[in-house]
Amino acid sequence: MATSENDKRSKPSSLRSIIAGSTAGAVEIAITYPAEFAKTRSQLNRRLPDAKKLPWPPFGSQWYAGCTTLIIGNSLKAGIRFVAFDWLKSLLQDENGQISGPKTVIAGFGAGFTESLLAVTPFESIKTQLIDDRKSQNPRMRGFLHGSRVIFQERGVRGFFQGFVPTTARQAANSATRFSSYTMLKQMAQGYVAPGEKLGTASTFALGGIAGLITVYVTQPLDTVKTSRMQSLEASKNYKNSFVCAARIFKDEGIFTFWSGAVPRLARLIMSGGIVFTMYEKTMDALDGLDPERRYI
């Protein structure tokens, strides 16, 4: 009976995972979006000669172009990511509730694939095309809903899912790296606290930030190919597929170009890693306070 109760408390319900994950995702992107804008703009502008590069706008509303899209998308994808990871982790853990490093990586890959299919690819495609559209003298897209309609009219459903393979590869690697890094670091940190005691907010934030740093340098090449090949407005004319894109980048611009945009992405993912894991853990604690027996949530 005690074991059953412990299992129940160690395995959050799907609803609880969705609530905690979605809350964490919304707060994360609302705080870190300007760094995401800078990363995407630097990648999209690198194809232009110096004389045609647009100057960086003053910090303000233009830095939040596409923000509404990404807040909605990030909240959705974080909820999907955490519920998928928690579910897969519960399937892969042993009878004592423990999970090995390789199995954590597998759960992370599965979570990344799921969120890419259901949220990341369509929402990031819209976001990137909104930002790219603002490079023109006469932008045509007036926000999320209007931009979605323009994309559908001009490119059909493929306009939302073009780039699924590189995006999914990037997202699966992203989730696998982030979850496995955070889980490993958390297990190490818990060895320094009393049994049953939870890590503090500062410790959780620091561990999430370190996991974010590791994630950037592992997945940045996939992120660069995804943005260059699949989701700019001119991508279909410039590249046939992601492999051609990667080869062209390597040949024309050199290997270090794969890490273009790493610095602003580094700033965002260190912050977002700390924010998202801290918010997830704290939301779980708050839900425990509201429903300690986990009867309703």
Swiss-Prot record:
Keywords: Membrane, Mitochondrion, Mitochondrion inner membrane, Repeat, Translocase, Transmembrane, Transmembrane helix, Transport
InterPro entries recorded: Mitochondrial_sb/sol_carrier (IPR018108), Mt_carrier_dom_sf (IPR023395), TXTP-like (IPR049563)
Solcar repeats: 12-91, 102-188, 199-286
EC number assigned by the record: 7.-.-.-
UniProt topology in membrane: Multi-pass membrane protein
Annotated Gene Ontology cellular component terms: mitochondrial inner membrane
Main location: mitochondrion
Localization, UniProt: Mitochondrion inner membrane
PROSITE patterns linked to this entry: SOLCAR
Gene Ontology BP annotations: mitochondrial citrate transmembrane transport
Family that this chain belongs to: Belongs to the mitochondrial carrier (TC 2.A.29) family.
UniProt protein name: Mitochondrial citrate transporter A
Species in which this protein is naturally found: Aspergillus niger (strain ATCC 1015 / CBS 113.46 / FGSC A1144 / LSHB Ac4 / NCTC 3858a / NRRL 328 / USDA 3528.7)
